[in-house]
Amino acid sequence: MNELKNDRYLRALLRQPVDMTPVWMMRQAGRYLPEYKATRAIAGDFMSLCKNAELACEVTMQPLRRYPLDAAILFSDILTIPDAMGLGLYFETGEGPRFQSPITCRADVEKLPIPDPEQELGYVMNAVRTIRRELAGSVPLIGFSGSPWTLATYMVEGGSSKAFTKLKKMMYAEPQTLHLLLDKLADSVILYLNAQIKAGAQSVMIFDTWGGVLTGRDYHEFSLNYMHKIVDGLIRENEGRRVPVTLFTKGGGPWLEAMAATGCDALGLDWTTDIADARRRVGDKVALQGNMDPSVLYAPPARIEQEVSTILASFGQGEGHVFNLGHGIHQDVPPAHAGAFVNAVHALSRPYHQK
């Protein structure tokens, strides 16, 4: 495999010295880019785009051609695992993801298979290998998965939800059924992420988009517990270097200490957590990724630069910061504003890394 020309992102995740703060954006390959829309039109629909290694590679590379980003992230979807378990993923226009066969009872959970990632999810591994070849060592490639709790929200609700009543009913009325589901999902995620690492992912991230809807007790029992199991099961060395693991719970600000104790290398922060406070609490254990409100990108470039400057100053001197948004970039952000953001991070961060 190619020697990395820019390993700033991997170094920052391990709290090693860098010349400037690395930056990438969640959903950096996406609908705010006209070239993405054009490629998706060629594919026909979202899952066809994910399942075609060449097209998935193309959309992964598109933001890197526009912006000096410090990492590429695999173009895929968190719902590939439940789809491979046989739930029948499809996308309703304007409605988001849906499942033809959602989980309704214990029998549904018991019959769920644990997918073989090179078989049922081989298209993801093909995309990873294709992207690594295309990157040719320019920047690292991030692999990812949804967390068991977040995957379960879609599998039990049958799609997106605001109140999660079906899943919370299962959690409170049939906790053992939910634990069985989460355990199967954790085993599936371990196999899936390890296959991504073997295929060439140089860092992995676990997205716990919906962990923040839980009480503290329930978060520990039904979400963090299973992410901890995954971290324990991951390959942590490959191609002669460490493979860093980042956990991201949206709304996870109250639980950073417990998240840092899982053995992960970094925590993603949403914009509701103060990064200075987060660094005081866990900065001696993990790196921090984040955490600009994605809506700042609607503002003029001068305002974007001001926000970047504020967050850099809030984190302060030294290592262990990967700049990112606090969640995915919105689809109607002007591409030039994303460019202003990336350039501002690089331009304004150098003084924070001088010895």
From Swiss-Prot:
PROSITE patterns: UROD_1, UROD_2. GO terms for molecular function: uroporphyrinogen decarboxylase activity. SUPFAM superfamilies: UROD/MetE-like. Its EC number is 4.1.1.37. The record marks 77 as: Transition state stabilizer. GO terms for biological process: heme biosynthetic process; protoporphyrinogen IX biosynthetic process from glutamate. Pathway: Porphyrin-containing compound metabolism; protoporphyrin-IX biosynthesis; coproporphyrinogen-III from 5-aminolevulinate: step 4/4. Substrate binds at residues 27-31, 46, 77, 154, 209, 327. Keywords: Cytoplasm, Decarboxylase, Lyase, Porphyrin biosynthesis. Belongs to the uroporphyrinogen decarboxylase family. Catalyzes the decarboxylation of four acetate groups of uroporphyrinogen-III to yield coproporphyrinogen-III. Homodimer. PANTHER family: METHYLTETRAHYDROFOLATE:HOMOCYSTEINE METHYLTRANSFERASE RELATED (PTHR21091), UROPORPHYRINOGEN DECARBOXYLASE (PTHR21091:SF169). This is Uroporphyrinogen decarboxylase. It comes from Yersinia pestis. The gene is hemE.
